[in-house]
């Protein structure tokens, strides 16, 4: 069959790579993709992921059987709806169901209604109310802007000055807009991907841990993710089971009960508190860079899993008996302003690297985004995989990239 992957980043590179391995898949297309994907997919960088009509025309022309949507924006913009209305199979939720990521308030309200464990919250609609609220709120406080923010719409404020600054950042010159304040939760964060079709929820039996902050020791601003690893040895199968029972199954049922037909992967960003696992966020798609490490470890056929889910079967994932560590190299300045167009070399285009922000300029690759390339390390345990990942990092040549030096350290410290 012919499969079209929507998106241009490292997550989509990993999806295309994994789908290309399937015996069920004849041809992988990518829109817009990136030029690093050309060994595994027919890449169409001339088509934008926001040009729904062009994507539909392409899918018709190429007899596409399945469309796999990687990023959140096309989902929230309703690309899945348009494709389904024209008879295409789509892995990714419709516009209504994608609100679970598109609106933090939507997610909070549904969790509150169905008693799904999460932090207490307060919503405000005006800047002046936000400034009033923080005068007496408990610190630290988590400040979230409603809507999409590419993983950067969350600020943890330890002081009242930091909270005021967060509000200024969230509102800018606007006086109105929804901001959600949350009680700060302490504990170990982890990411659980769950395949969902209506009230059928099939969680991965392998979790990943992301590293959101820009710099070592979890310092600096939030990013889209500076690295990830799997499995997470210090989070037990019992925690996974509990997360499934208290979060994954209830949210699938809640969404269906509220009239939202979710089909795709639901990313559960959770935290293991002293009172058990609680939800930090939901995403309506694979995490990035979690997808890259999880799909590298997945032994079974991703396309088969998607078909099983579509048929309402409780699909069984199989995993390689190894650890995977992914280290993200990003443009200096990210997640704030950064330069583009700098040469990057030293990497190969096989399973050792997944590309997020590079484009071809003549025969060389140059930077085109904030997060640039993820180096993948593999090993019998986290320590060996981490060593391998940083060996892969050392092979990349560029004066304009930075990376964290402590990806997966937590797993080694908590052994």
Swiss-Prot record:
Necessary cofactors: Mg(2+); Mn(2+)
Listed InterPro entries: ATP-grasp, ATP_grasp_subdomain_1, PreATP-grasp_dom_sf, PRibGlycinamid_synth_ATP-grasp, PRibGlycinamide_synth, PRibGlycinamide_synth_C-dom, PRibGlycinamide_synth_C_sf, PRibGlycinamide_synth_CS
Sites where the protein binds ATP: 134-191
Enzyme Commission code: 6.3.4.13
Cofactor, free-text remark: Binds 1 Mg(2+) or Mn(2+) ion per subunit.
Keyword Cell membrane: no
Pathway linked to the protein: Purine metabolism; IMP biosynthesis via de novo pathway; N(1)-(5-phospho-D-ribosyl)glycinamide from 5-phospho-alpha-D-ribose 1-diphosphate: step 2/2
Domain ATP-grasp span(s) in chain numbering: 108-311
Enzyme class, broadest EC rank: ligase
Pfam families referenced in this protein's UniProt entry, alphabetically: GARS_A, GARS_C, GARS_N
Gene Ontology BP annotations: 'de novo' IMP biosynthetic process; purine nucleobase biosynthetic process
Residues reported to bind Mg(2+): 281, 283
Record key words, sorted: ATP-binding, Ligase, Magnesium, Manganese, Metal-binding, Nucleotide-binding, Purine biosynthesis
Sequence intervals crossing the membrane: none
UniProt keyword annotation of Phosphoprotein present: no
Endpoints of the signal sequence: none
Highest taxon above the source species: Bacteria
Record-linked PROSITE patterns: ATP_GRASP, GARS
HAMAP family with a match to the protein in the record: GARS (MF_00138)
The protein's name in its UniProt record: Phosphoribosylamine--glycine ligase
Organism field: Staphylococcus aureus (strain MSSA476)
């Amino acid at each position: 069959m012919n499969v079209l992957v929507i998106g241009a980043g490292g997550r989509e590179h990993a999806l295309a790579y994994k789908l290309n391995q399937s015996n069920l898949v004849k041809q992988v297309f990518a829109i817009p993709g990136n030029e690093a994907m050309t060994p595994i997919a027919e890449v169409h960088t001339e088509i934008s992921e926001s040009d729904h009509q062009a994507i539909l025309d392409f899918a018709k022309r190429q007899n596409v059987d399945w469309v796999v949507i990687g990023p959140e924006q096309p989902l929230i913009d309703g690309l899945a709806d348009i494709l389904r209305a024209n008879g295409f199979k789509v892995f990714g939720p419709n516009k209504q169901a994608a609100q679970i990521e598109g609106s933090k308030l939507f997610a909070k309200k549904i969790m509150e209604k169905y008693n799904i464990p999460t932090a207490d919250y307060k919503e405000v609609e005006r800047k002046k109310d936000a400034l009033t609220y923080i005068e007496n709120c408990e610190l630290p406080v988590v400040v979230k802007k409603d809507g999409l923010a590419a993983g950067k719409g969350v600020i943890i404020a330890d002081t009242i000055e930091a909270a005021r600054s967060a509000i200024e950042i969230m509102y800018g010159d606007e006086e109105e807009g929804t901001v959600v304040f949350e009680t700060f939760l302490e504990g170990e964060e982890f990411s659980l991907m769950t395949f969902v079709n209506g009230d059928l929820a099939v969680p991965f039996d392998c979790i990943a841990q992301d590293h959101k902050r820009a710099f070592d020791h979890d310092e600096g601003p939030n990013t889209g993710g500076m690295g990830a690893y799997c499995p997470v040895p210090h989070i037990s199968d019992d925690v996974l089971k509990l997360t499934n029972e208290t979060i994954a199954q209830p949210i699938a049922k809640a969404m269906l009960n509220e009239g939202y037909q979710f089909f795709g992967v639901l990313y559960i960003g959770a935290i293991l508190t002293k009172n058990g696992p609680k939800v930090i966020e939901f995403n309506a798609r694979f995490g990035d860079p979690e997808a890259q490490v999880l799909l590298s470890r997945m032994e079974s056929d991703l396309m088969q899993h998607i078909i099983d889910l579509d048929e309402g079967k409780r699909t069984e994932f199989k995993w390689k008996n190894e650890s995977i560590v992914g280290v993200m190299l990003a443009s200096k300045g990210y997640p704030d302003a950064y330069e583009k167009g700098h040469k990057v070399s030293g990497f190969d285009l096989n399973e050792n690297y997944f590309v997020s922000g590079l484009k071809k300029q003549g025969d060389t690759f140059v930077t085109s985004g904030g997060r640039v390339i993820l180096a993948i390390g593999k090993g019998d345990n986290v320590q060996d995989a981490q060593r391998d990942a940083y060996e892969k990092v050392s092979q990349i040549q560029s004066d304009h990239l930075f990376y964290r030096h402590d990806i997966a350290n937590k797993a080694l410290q908590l052994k």
